[in-house]
Amino acid sequence: MLPLTKIWLCYGIFSAILMIFMIVLLSVSKHFTNSFYRVITMDIILNLLCWVNTWPSRMVFREDGFGFARFLYEFYNKSFDVSFFLSNVFFHVQSASTICICCHRLSTAIFDNSNRFWSRFYLLVYALIILYSFLAVQLLYRAPIKFDYELNKFYSEPATLDQRLSVAMYLRCFMSGYLLAIIIIALSTLYQVRKRIAPFDHLHKNLLRKMSLIAFSHTFVFTMLLAWQTLNSFVVYASFIELLMIVSDMISFSMAYILLIFDGNVRSVIKNNLPVIQINGRRISDAQRSQNNIT
């Protein structure tokens, strides 16, 4: 196994476990009843599925992934076409989900009954996001991936010049559109949240600030990576696929780490429920008591 694949697996498996843990935590804990956490949970679920779906695409043309790719192809010869199709679907899903998170914060800052609306309709909103993403991909040309049994290697059917130009224009238009939409909504949200926070009590202010910080941190990460993708669509790299996969992983895993860093409730619940942390905490407390008794 090549070093890059080992790196992908090491940080990927750890991050995937963290994401699953966050999904369970946000779904079952009574501390996370706000609709914001329902939206965040959906975002993490979809990003986890996105990461799983990247593996056929990232391994098909790598020498250390040949056995895995050959097995998938012989099991179902459309596996890589489906994976490539879903990768493009997830590009739209991730972008629209980030916009959805921004819209949640914006609507919460403007409307008093926003939490009730999102609690009722967040599943419908994400169903519409997925439907839109599938429809948007229909505009994109997808070159099928096949296996040459004589040469014993995978290959992608060559696209015509018009098809390549069409794909480049498609990506640039959607990336630029998403980037612009995210920036506009994020700035509007920032203005509304600052205006909204003033009249509330200290506890409510802290809640608004915390949720806004999580949303803005995720938006910032996604915006920077989307800007990078947009700019680099004009440049061709020899290792573009490897770079693209790393960027995709950063987007997919970002929300779980942002919650862990910025959400005090998440850290508090983890601290109070993980046996190892509780045992260590008791040992420290016992040691401190012993020292106090000695002195």
From Swiss-Prot:
Query: Domain of life here?
Result: Eukaryota
Q: Name one GO cellular component term.
A: membrane
Q: How does it sit in the membrane?
A: Multi-pass membrane protein
Ranges that cross the membrane: 7-27, 39-61, 121-141, 173-193, 211-230, 241-261
Name where it's found.
Membrane
A Gene Ontology molecular function term for this protein is:
transmembrane signaling receptor activity
Protein keywords: Membrane, Transmembrane, Transmembrane helix
Q: Which cysteines are joined by disulfide bonds?
A: none
Q: Pfam families, per this entry?
A: Srg (PF02118)
Single Gene Ontology BP annotation: sensory perception of chemical stimulus
Signal peptide positions (record)? none
- Family, similarity comment: Belongs to the nematode receptor-like protein srg family.
Name the record gives this protein:
Serpentine receptor class gamma-53
Q: Give the gene that encodes this protein.
A: srg-53
